[in-house]
Amino acid sequence: MLTVLAALSLLSLLTSATGRLAPDELCYAEPRRTGSPPNTQPERPPVIFEPPTIAIKAESKGCELILLDPPIDVSYRREDKVNASIAWFFDFGACRMPIAYREYYGCIGNAVPSPETCDAYSFTLIRTEGIVEFTIVNMSLLFQPGIYDSGNFIYSVLLDYHIFTGRVTLEVEKDTNYPCGMIHGLTAYGNINVDETMDNASPHPRAVGCFPEPIDNEAWANVTFTELGIPDPNSFLDDEGDYPNISDCHSWESYTYPNTLRQATGPQTLLVGAVGLRILAQAWKFVGDETYDTIRAEAKNLETHVPSSAAESSLENQSTQEESNSPEVAHLRSVNSDDSTHTGGASNGIQDCDSQLKTVYACLALIGLGTCAMIGLIVYICVLRSKLSSRNFSRAQNVKHRNYQRLEYVA
């Protein structure tokens, strides 16, 4: 049993999976207030309860809008209502910077906590710099990475009384030959040298990622700064000191309330639109005859080249060699699932990552060998004890027999 548990622990530590693109439903820039609104302040500060025990890999390139998912499988749990919280941090090595935090109340026990599966949820604490770059979607972290966002993201989940912590290592492609502004990110404050390339020699599609539909200039006029967690530039109470900075970085044992996080009172759908607004309002880098409309059209055309997960198996045998050599198809990262909710656990991560199959087989072989060794040891101990018992019994009989003869002789 100990061998099996040790092997399963090894499997959980070796689990890795490719990060997923955000579904098209999250790529919008208009203010939406659909769904349940938050109605209370968080009851607890965001903390990392214990060092991460799960390692996950994620990738991003171009203008992709991505979701970092904590791989927590809740399907085995009972439906009894529970409370939950999710905190996201960025790991600078010596300290962790908080990025976003939210609490959920009265959630269905075997469903991923979300505004739809919970009775209520708190205001979202997010890291903002006059714009909304990050937000939480259910339990996942939503943002459009820049080349300076490569690094380790840590999630800290409290589900009822159970703690889940893990590390998501995000690798952002260094190629900046895309129309969006990729020269940004969390590590830019640390003056970390990132090799920026404009490799026009290797052609690839530039319209890769999320390109929200243009909106009217007055669409966000009725949205308050408080709803977005942004300091009011017209208020003397919100000065530059309230903006986040890299100095607000905490050690594992720190339980101080992060100054970098501001309270956003808007619903989840509004904050998702605010992330899309940042994407739409950025300084675009068009080449030649490119316009935003042509880029959006090209992006939609590229999406049609990527088969859906339902039709992927049936289309696999029908794909031609010409299609496989297409630079557009080759450069796109295929998406295995378009669901906005991720409930996969360690086993799902192993199944989705072909590069881990050898490791999985080796670990399963170790489990088998360990089990056989354990059974053999138990059998050996049983046989040894049987022999010892038989020998002791024989000695007792001999002693008894000698004593009997002695008494008979005396008599």
Curated annotation (Swiss-Prot):
Any one GO CC term of the record: viral envelope
Signal peptide region: 1-19
Keywords, comma-separated and alphabetical: Glycoprotein, Membrane, Signal, Transmembrane, Transmembrane helix, Viral envelope protein, Virion
Keyword Transmembrane helix: yes
Disulfide bridge positions per record: none
UniProt family annotation: Belongs to the alphaherpesvirinae glycoprotein G family.
Protein name, as recorded: Envelope glycoprotein G
Species, as recorded: Equine herpesvirus 1 (strain Ab4p) (EHV-1)
